[in-house]
Every structure is written in structure tokens, then in C-alpha cells.
């Protein structure tokens, strides 16, 4: 049996391929930054569908025009953020996207996937 050593810095990489389950929502943050919120539904071969919230800072304007039903490749990292709402501390786990590409753009999707996999430590 072999063992794998994970680097101390760790790796936080999320790759999703799924369907945009609702139209994107573009919001302006108090900082002035814009965030595009996406809801991506992933349907594993043997299992129930899972809905994954995605936040994309600095998304290109064209992405706000995507519509529900579009198949997307999402590359990013998992983040759990905490906030106060209605006087209570709440949390939300989401994928913070670094790249989102419609899968119909096969060359761009392949490039994004290869780039993401290239960030993994060599010893994995």
C-alpha cells in the first residue's frame, strides 16, 4: 500500500460540470465589486441531483446573459462564509469561481480544465 503526502499548504480545488438551474444574478457589493451568483445543478450517475451555489467575482458581462439550462464547467474553490442575518450568525458554503465556461465551448472548457488540474501538487 502506498501513501500520499498532502502539502502543508493544502489544496482547495473544485471542478463542477452541471446545468445552470436559474438565470444568473448580478449584484453590486458595498465595496463596489460585482459578483455574479450562479446555481449549478450536478447530477451524478448514481445519486440525487445536488445544487451548488457559485459566486464569481469579476465575471465578464456576457456571463450575466446566460440562461437556465446552459451546461457549464466551473473551476474554483470551496468557501464557507459567515454573516449576520435577522440577529443570528448564519453560514453559506459555496464555490468561488475563478473560471466558468459553457461546455458548448469545448476548446475553452478543455483549456480551463487542464489549467485547473495543472495546479495540483505533483505528488498527488
Regions found by a protein language model. Give the residues of each.
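Single-stranded nucleic acid-binding surfaces, predominantly the OB-fold ssDNA-binding core
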Residues: 1-124
Amino acid at each position: 500500500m502506498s501513501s500520499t503526502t498532502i502539502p502543508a499548504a493544502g489544496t482547495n480545488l473544485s471542478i463542477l460540470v452541471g446545468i445552470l438551474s436559474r438565470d444568473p444574478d448580478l449584484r453590486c457589493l458595498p465595496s463596489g465589486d460585482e459578483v455574479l451568483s450562479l446555481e449549478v445543478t450536478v447530477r451524478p450517475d448514481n445519486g440525487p441531483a445536488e445544487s451548488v451555489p457559485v459566486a464569481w467575482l469579476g465575471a465578464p458581462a456576457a456571463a450575466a446573459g446566460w440562461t437556465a439550462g446552459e451546461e457549464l464547467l466551473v473551476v474554483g474553490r470551496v468557501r464557507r462564509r459567515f454573516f449576520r442575518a435577522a440577529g443570528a450568525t448564519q453560514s453559506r458554503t459555496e464555490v468561488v469561481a475563478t473560471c466558468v465556461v459553457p461546455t458548448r465551448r469545448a476548446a475553452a472548457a478543455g483549456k480551463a480544465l487542464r489549467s485547473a488540474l495543472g495546479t495540483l501538487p505533483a505528488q498527488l
